[in-house]
């Protein structure tokens, strides 16, 4: 699948023969990206839900009373929404053999946003980890609150891991596009 953009010399791109094996490799690669994006979505959504439901009693601790926990919730919710969009784009690409946006925009959009949101998750979950460590001394009274906060943070780190792997794959697509003029080397 070559880029519809002309070569640097000004000529049009040539239509190259593409074997069935190449098409299958491309679909397999895109399916693998979809699996990692789905995992990032699931873990980020679960982390956001765990943090959102982390309140104990009316006079007790609430997650929204702590800036770091609000950051963990917001970052994971944003990444869950982004991952949902990227899953839809991946399904579109697998089913139609074409990207949602023009190919050059799609590869840079995917790579850039994967990087930004992966670092957002890493930053938020690191801040949440530091607060959770600080709260360990007070966890004798509110053990359930602390455990649920820890679970939300661990789920967020798992979301970061899968988003980071997706970022590696989207980086591979950027490099292939730069070298070949196509998002996948076939």
Swiss-Prot record:
The chain crosses the membrane at residues 32-52, 72-92, 104-124, 151-171. Belongs to the Casparian strip membrane proteins (CASP) family. Residues 53-71, 125-150 are extracellular. PANTHER family: CASP-LIKE PROTEIN 4A4, CASP-LIKE PROTEIN 4C1. Residues 1-31, 93-103, 172-186 are cytoplasmic. This is CASP-like protein 4C2. Keywords: Cell membrane, Membrane, Transmembrane, Transmembrane helix. Homodimer and heterodimers.
């Amino acid at each position: 699948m070559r880029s519809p953009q002309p070569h640097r010399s000004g000529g049009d791109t040539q239509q190259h023969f593409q074997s069935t094996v190449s098409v299958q490799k491309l679909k397999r690669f895109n399916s693998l990206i979809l699996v990692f994006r789905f995992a990032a979505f699931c873990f980020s959504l679960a982390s956001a839900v765990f943090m959102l439901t982390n309140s104990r009693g009316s006079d007790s601790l609430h997650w929204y009373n702590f800036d770091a926990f609000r950051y963990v919730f917001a970052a994971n919710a944003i990444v869950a929404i982004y991952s949902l969009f990227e899953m839809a784009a991946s399904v579109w690409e697998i089913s139609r053999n074409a990207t949602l946006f023009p190919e050059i925009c799609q590869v840079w959009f995917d790579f850039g946003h994967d990087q930004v949101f992966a670092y957002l998750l890493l930053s938020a979950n690191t801040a949440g980890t530091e607060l959770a460590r600080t709260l360990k001394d007070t966890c004798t009274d509110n053990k359930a609150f602390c455990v649920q906060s820890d679970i939300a943070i661990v789920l967020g780190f798992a979301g970061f891991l899968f988003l980071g792997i997706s970022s590696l794959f989207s980086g591979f697509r950027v490099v292939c596009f730069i070298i070949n003029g196509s998002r996948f080397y076939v």
